Structures are given as C-alpha cells and as structure tokens.
C-alpha cells in the first residue's frame, strides 16, 4: 500500500517502512505524528484520489532525526562590471519513518 502525502509545500509518494527527508517539522525526535493531508491512496491496481484530499485517510510517521542538507552555493556575476556575489544556504530537514497508512 502506498500514499501520496503533502507536507512542507511538497508532495511525497510513501509506503510503509520507508524513510524520507521532508522540510523541517517542529517535533521532538521519537515523537509520532499523524499526517492527514493525504492526496491519494493506492493498493495494487486500485487507487483512491482525493478532491483534493482523501477523506478519512491518514499516515502515521515517527520522527527519526533533524539535520541540515549539504550547502548550496550561489554565485552571481555581471560580466565586465566587476560585480561578484557569493552566498551559501543550508536547508533544515526532518527525517521520518513511515508507519501505518490508513485509507
């Protein structure tokens, strides 16, 4: 069984037992969270697609860790104008373990 969930403005296709990294969620490590923004639920060849959400469908996840992604380096330059700008960014993430999918 799989589900398409929405968290942090992004959509993820998940199945029970998987680990995913999502945008940072304000939760403690080891805490269980119920995600109710389920866009679709499928099992085998049957699929339920919500309009926009599947009513009554939930996904239970466990917070494994918090961290930061690798640095993304931004470099801007205007040719012949002696303008160069460097910038770096590290995005925070939360690693989740997918538990039960109800739907």
From Swiss-Prot:
Descriptive protein name: Large ribosomal subunit protein bL21
Any GO MF annotation of the entry: rRNA binding
Alphabetized Pfam families for the sequence: Ribosomal_L21p
PROSITE patterns: RIBOSOMAL_L21
Superkingdom of origin: Bacteria
Transmembrane regions: none
UniProt key word DNA repair: no
Keywords noted in UniProt: Ribonucleoprotein, Ribosomal protein, RNA-binding, rRNA-binding
Function as written in the Swiss-Prot or TrEMBL entry: This protein binds to 23S rRNA in the presence of protein L20.
Family label: Belongs to the bacterial ribosomal protein bL21 family.
Record note on quaternary structure: Part of the 50S ribosomal subunit. Contacts protein L20.
Cellular component aspect of the GO annotation: cytoplasm; ribonucleoprotein complex; ribosome
Recorded name of the encoding gene: rplU
Organism whose genome encodes this protein: Polaromonas naphthalenivorans (strain CJ2)
InterPro entries from the UniProt entry: bL21-like, bL21-like_sf, Ribosomal_bL21, Ribosomal_bL21_CS
Gene Ontology BP annotations: translation
